[in-house]
Amino acid sequence: MRQDIVIRGTTRTGLLLLLPDEGEFSAVLERLAERLASSGRFFVGGRVQVHVGNRRLSPEDREALEQTLQRSGMVLLSVKEGGDPLAEVQAPEAGAPSAPPPPAGNTLVVTKTVRSGQEIRHDGDVIILGDVNPGAVVVATGHIVVMGALRGVAHAGCTGNRTAIVAATKLRPTQLRIAEVIGRAPDGDAPQSYPEVARIRGDLIVVEASAEKRQVSALEAVGAKEDR
């Protein structure tokens, strides 16, 4: 029996929403609406599979659930009742990045390369033990650390955390965002033999070399403010 609302990111389906299977369902939906509202626009556009545990939903319950998600800009893919939600929804897919449940500290660790067309969204920090290919997207409310090449889109501190960072062994994103500030990597593919860290300074995103390399290079940051 579950008593808490749990939202987990996956690379296979987008989001997995686990709902409590005790208490009035209307009360659960009220708690869900409050949780989503407190996350701002983080989950907007998210595709969701919902697991309701041992609860059996009526057609009216399903409609109310879908409306609650739609009000937060989310898309309901399916509703599952009974069984193991992690086994059914997060079963490994050949060649797909692994996205295990977040360990202590609300950090999501992905142990494979994130491919083009795949998207990771997580409420917390994200660590990727692999590359982020062009066409892949990583969004986090906290830091993003890539132990490989970052060539896709990365958005750290997406709910407004300007102290968030994006770090990578090779930092060449097609687009880089921290909070509301948007930048991109310089044109070309200059050699890089050390990790780099991107952070906000003033209203620009700058890239700092690793501790032993005290060089600082500015991104071609437009300092654009994301439309809200």
Curated annotation (Swiss-Prot):
It comes from Symbiobacterium thermophilum (strain DSM 24528 / JCM 14929 / IAM 14863 / T). SUPFAM superfamilies: Cell-division inhibitor MinC, C-terminal domain. Keywords: Cell cycle, Cell division, Septation. GO terms for biological process: cell morphogenesis; division septum assembly; regulation of cell septum assembly. This is Probable septum site-determining protein MinC. Interacts with MinD and FtsZ. Belongs to the MinC family. Cell division inhibitor that blocks the formation of polar Z ring septums. Rapidly oscillates between the poles of the cell to destabilize FtsZ filaments that have formed before they mature into polar Z rings. Prevents FtsZ polymerization. InterPro entries: CAP/MinC_C, MinC, MinC_C_sf, MinC_N_1, Septum_form_inhib_MinC_C. NCBIfam families: minC. Gene3D superfamilies: 2.160.20.70, 3.30.160.540. Pfam families: MinC_C, MinC_N_1.
